[in-house]
């Protein structure tokens, strides 16, 4: 049998895009021989290493593409601070069943109660479990789409918000939205309706959403209809965690 040429094998592995196997096959072959492991065991170790590397890279890519401002986890959440929070409800959301059922998640509460933290943690968990995610704010969506419309590329820009398995819309209601902005946001909500879920954080209870959308009751009703038809609403009550030190003094 002609001896294997490592250079030729390395080139073939590069062409097949198998970096883990290329880097480790010689060392693992030596180790397998020393341990008298079978060829199948050796091959399984190589393939398992390649698969693990690819999965880790996929996770890193999904997290990078999600554009989280920071990374948060459920373990970091301060459960003791909010005056009212349904912990079992939130923990159940992290089973991620809402993605398969296209159920929206709406986190309602005043500023500084951890709504953004929970939305990021939920998105991060989705990334770890193989789902694409995009984190953005309501104002950023409107500004991006308005600029795209002026540049004649609105249809293409819509895909940024329609493609992810989970779209996180942070800070809905913190700033007023004019008629044009509300129409653009409605198109995103409408096109994701019963196709892919959204995670929305807001400081406004539903009965005050018309104040967000320039007191347009018709548009507000249409938005609420699509958001709430399949939705899990999380109510958080209390004082801002960012004011914790001042409050406790």
Go through the PLM ranges and name each one.
Residues 7, 11-14, 23-26, 41-45, ...:
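Solvent-exposed alpha-helical segments within well-ordered globular domains of core cellular machineries
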Residues 85-163, 212:
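Conserved P-loop
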Residues 15-19, 28-31, 49, 53, ...:
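Conserved, well-folded catalytic cores of nucleic-acid-processing
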Residues 10, 18-70:
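Interdomain "pre-motor" coupling segment immediately N-terminal to P-loop NTPase/helicase cores
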Residues 53, 58-92, 100:
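Clamp-loader machinery-focused feature within the broader ASCE/P-loop NTPase space
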Residues 1-11, 153, 246-249:
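Intrinsically disordered, low-complexity and often Lys/Arg-enriched segments
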């Amino acid at each position: 049998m002609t001896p294997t040429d490592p250079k030729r094998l390395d080139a073939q592995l590069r062409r097949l895009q198998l970096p883990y196997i290329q880097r480790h096959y010689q060392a693992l072959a030596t180790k397998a021989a020393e341990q008298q492991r079978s060829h199948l065991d050796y091959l399984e170790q190589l393939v398992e290493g390649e698969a693990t590397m690819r999965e880790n890279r996929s996770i890193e890519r999904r997290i990078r593409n999600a554009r989280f401002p920071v990374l948060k986890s459920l373990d970091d959440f301060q459960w003791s601070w909010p005056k009212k929070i349904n912990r079992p409800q939130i923990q159940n959301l992290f089973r991620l069943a809402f993605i398969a059922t296209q159920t929206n998640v709406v986190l309602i509460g005043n500023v500084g109660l951890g709504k953004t933290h929970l939305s990021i943690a939920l998105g991060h968990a989705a990334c770890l479990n193989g789902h694409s995610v995009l984190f953005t704010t309501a104002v950023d969506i409107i500004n991006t789409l308005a600029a795209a419309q002026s540049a004649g590329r609105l249809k293409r820009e819509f895909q940024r918000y329609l493609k992810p398995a989970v779209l996180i819309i942070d800070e809905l209601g913190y700033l007023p939205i004019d008629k044009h902005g509300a129409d653009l946001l409605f198109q995103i909500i409408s096109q994701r309706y019963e196709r892919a879920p959204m995670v929305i954080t807001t400081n406004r209870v539903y009965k005050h959403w018309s104040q967000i959308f320039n007191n347009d009751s018709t548009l507000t009703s249409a938005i609420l209809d699509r958001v709430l038809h399949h939705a899990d609403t999380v109510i958080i009550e209390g004082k801002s965690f960012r004011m914790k030190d001042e409050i406790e003094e």
